[in-house]
Amino acid sequence: MVQKSGMSRGPYPPSQEIPMEVFDPSPQGKYSKRKGRFKRSDGSTSSDTTSNSFVRQGSAESYTSRPSDSDVSLEEDREALRKEAERQALAQLEKAKTKPVAFAVRTNVGYNPSPGDEVPVQGVAITFEPKDFLHIKEKYNNDWWIGRLVKEGCEVGFIPSPVKLDSLRLLQEQTLRQNRLSSSKSGDNSSSSLGDVVTGTRRPTPPASAKQKQKSTEHVPPYDVVPSMRPIILVGPSLKGYEVTDMMQKALFDFLKHRFDGRISITRVTADISLAKRSVLNNPSKHIIIERSNTRSSLAEVQSEIERIFELARTLQLVALDADTINHPAQLSKTSLAPIIVYIKITSPKVLQRLIKSRGKSQSKHLNVQIAASEKLAQCPPEMFDIILDENQLEDACEHLAEYLEAYWKATHPPSRTPPNPLLNRTMATAALAVSPAPVSNLQGPYLVSGDQPLDRATGEHASVHEYPGELGQPPGLYPSNHPPGRAGTLWALSRQDTFDADTPGSRNSVYTEPGDSCVDMETDPSEGPGPGDPAGGGTPPARQGSWEEEEDYEEEMTDNRNRGRNKARYCAEGGGPVLGRNKNELEGWGQGVYIR
């Protein structure tokens, strides 16, 4: 029994050692630390106290990384302000669609919007290339305008202002400069540049020329202000002031007058508008040089004509200029007019020689000058012209010109815009001309004429083309439906004096032949003595007098027939004779309808 009790008490001595170890704190702490340091289940070597501190530190970091209520509210306010500004910008953009065009610009740089440009409404910025035309409706802020690209199908959007474009250019140059500096720090660039210095070799010249180009482009403004409607100017086939050139250009002016009735203003410009270069007008020191030179026009007169052209273009009607002094597109390349250059081209020099010789000795003696001017125009690259009319038939050339101008009209008058009122446009054009120097307006057909000297009328004032319909014994502005025999090719109802009644003696009026000319007269020498049908001969042919009386009865009928398609201008023999060669004589049909009245 004692042994059993002794055996049952056997485990007590080790159990008695456990309390001794429990009451000894230092061995217990050291052992527990070692145990916690080397025998953690996760295999880490950090102690329990450090792990607890890490847990507490992590909870503090997670607490501080959370945005505060003030930060959240500030971000919401910014988003609300952005949405409100975008809503207002869209509303202003919608209102601008019905507003008139304030002014127009031609771009000298290109622009492709990027997300970092801070457009008022993302995705509504206008992309354009150099030499594009923009209609500006209004200013949105200092960085953005509201307008549209003058192109069919383009809508109103945001256009960067010159200030914005300059800032974008400076930012781009700064980025390029930083890229160059970073690339120059590389070992290859430094060693190559050092090798150039040591060996004494010179770098090629293109970098220097590139720097010069960069300096020259820095001073070019991003936009040039131009007329809201680009004026139409005819050049060729030779020099203005000579019969062949004037007759062909006059045929086109008369076609435009009737084809675009109510949508076009045609005006005579006698001042030398080639002097209206931006470098001249903006530099007062050059004014004295121009004034002292033997120029035809003074700078004040030129400036007045330019302002009048801008005023005409504000009505958004087509504007055609009969400019006496413009014979080459380079004359207007540095002006602010940005015209639509129409080149009347005669491909064969022999055809031009034949036309000049057919006008008589007075024109034949200036043959070399006219041929030289024609060759100079032919040497110009096609990019200098907007339209090249090289058709042999007048009808085809007119339709070619009409197609281009119809497309331009659609580009400048988008469908979203309120359709123009022709009567209102005519009134606006008349009001614009009222402030111009010595204008002549025509409300029956917006054929607007101006000159420098007053007419020798009883009133002493400029008058409309239709105010004196019986002065020359013919009603101007008609296309007769029936022509007497021998007049089937007649295209003109307006004489040169009626059309440009402000001309002075000795001007381009002398180009046009007398009423006695006929189709057969094209093959005769006009320098011969006056026939019985000429005013100097003391009489008027009965057929001519009767034809104008009959034409008055057909005025209403022909107002709806403005197209020249009914009157084909072909140079053919009278009396049903054989048609001459197409290359030479169908082209001469330009002159047949012009000279015969």
Curated annotation (Swiss-Prot):
Compositional bias per record (Polar residues), positions renumbered to this chain:
54-71
Membrane topology term reads: Peripheral membrane protein
Set out the biological process GO terms recorded for this chain's protein: calcium ion transport; cellular response to amyloid-beta; chemical synaptic transmission; protein targeting to membrane; regulation of calcium ion transmembrane transport via high voltage-gated calcium channel
Any Gene Ontology CC annotation: voltage-gated calcium channel complex
Q: Where is the composition biased (Gly residues)?
A: 530-540
Asked whether the keyword GTP-binding is assigned, the reply is: no
Listed InterPro entries: CAB1-4_N_A-dom, GK/Ca_channel_bsu, P-loop_NTPase, SH3-like_dom_sf, SH3_domain, VDCC_L_b1su, VDCC_L_bsu
The protein's matches in SMART domains, at most eight in alphabetical order, are given as: GuKc
Q: Which UniProt keywords apply?
A: Calcium, Calcium channel, Calcium transport, Cell membrane, Ion channel, Ion transport, Membrane, Phosphoprotein, SH3 domain, Transport, Voltage-gated channel
Provide ranges: composition bias, Low complexity.
43-53, 182-193
Subcellular compartments: Cell membrane, Sarcolemma; Cell membrane
Per the record, the domain of life is Eukaryota
Q: Residue limits of the SH3 domain? A: 100-169
Coarsely, its chief localization is membrane
* Modification Phosphothreonine, positions: T499
Give expression by tissue: Detected in brain.
User: Where do the segments described as Disordered lie?
Assistant: 1-79, 179-223, 466-597
For this protein, what is any one GO molecular function term?
calcium channel regulator activity
Similarity comment text for this entry: Belongs to the calcium channel beta subunit family.
Fetch the PANTHER family from UniProt: VOLTAGE-DEPENDENT CALCIUM CHANNEL BETA SUBUNIT
Query: What is annotated about its quaternary structure and interactions?
Result: Regulatory subunit of L-type calcium channels that consist of a pore-forming alpha subunit and auxiliary beta, gamma and delta subunits. Interacts with CACNA1A, CACNA1B, CACNA1C and CACNA1S. Component of a calcium channel complex consisting of a pore-forming alpha subunit (CACNA1S) and the ancillary subunits CACNB1 or CACNB2, CACNG1 and CACNA2D1. Identified in a complex with CACNA1C. Identified in a complex with the L-type calcium channel subunits CACNA1C, CACNA2D1, CACNB1 and one of the gamma subunits (CACNG4, CACNG6, CACNG7, or CACNG8).
Function, as annotated, reads: Regulatory subunit of L-type calcium channels. Regulates the activity of L-type calcium channels that contain CACNA1A as pore-forming subunit. Regulates the activity of L-type calcium channels that contain CACNA1C as pore-forming subunit and increases the presence of the channel complex at the cell membrane. Required for functional expression L-type calcium channels that contain CACNA1D as pore-forming subunit. Regulates the activity of L-type calcium channels that contain CACNA1B as pore-forming subunit.
Name the record gives this protein: Voltage-dependent L-type calcium channel subunit beta-1
Species of provenance? Rattus norvegicus (Rat)
